[in-house]
């Protein structure tokens, strides 16, 4: 059984980390992509917002409280271009994510004796509420890493002709 209080605290701390990595950047850095098919910092933040609102919280709710019902379909990869993430305002995007994260934390705190073993039968297999909960936190960690990688790559590109190699291997 997942320790809900620990997960809530880590999700709160990750919101702080995401804020530190996404706030007060130049517009150029917010929208910069290391390659044409990579995501920018701004796209990551908007992805986190939509995943918070339309994926994880929604799916945990469906598994716990609406057995047998199908959650609305999602298209996280497609949303990046369809919803023009990289054209949005960086500050407003971060603030929107933080509002959704606060709503998620409040919602999670309000759960009373959730059945983390409740199952959803997806076309690819069984998914439990607990699987979704821990994946939600893991998803944060993946994108905190991605935001750090984007900062590193941006610095390396902007620093030319100087090199970041002395810092150590990435």
What are the language-model segments listed below?
Residues 3, 41, 82-89, 124-128:
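Short amphipathic alpha-helical segments at helix-loop
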Residues 14, 78-117, 131-136, 146:
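Acidic/histidine-rich alpha-helical segments that form the ligand environment
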Residues 23-30, 109-117, 153-156:
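Surface-exposed helix-capping loop/turn segments at secondary-structure junctions
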């Amino acid at each position: 059984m997942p320790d809900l209080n620990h997960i809530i605290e880590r999700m709160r701390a990750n919101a702080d980390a995401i804020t530190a990595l996404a706030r007060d950047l130049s517009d150029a850095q917010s929208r910069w992509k290391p390659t044409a098919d990579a995501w920018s910092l701004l796209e990551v933040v908007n992805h986190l917002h939509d995943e918070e609102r339309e994926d994880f919280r929604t799916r945990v709710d469906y598994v716990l409280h609406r057995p047998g019902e199908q959650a609305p379909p999602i298209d996280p990869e497609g949303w990046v271009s369809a919803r023009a993430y990289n054209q949005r305002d960086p500050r407003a995007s971060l603030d929107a994510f933080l509002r959704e994260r606060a709503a998620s934390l409040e919602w999670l705190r309000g759960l009373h004796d959730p059945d983390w073993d409740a199952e959803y039968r997806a076309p690819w297999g069984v998914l439990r509420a607990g699987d979704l909960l821990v994946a939600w936190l893991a998803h944060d960690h993946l994108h905190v890493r991605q935001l750090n990688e984007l900062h590193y790559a941006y610095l390396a590109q902007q620093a030319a002709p100087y090199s970041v190699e002395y810092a150590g291997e990435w």
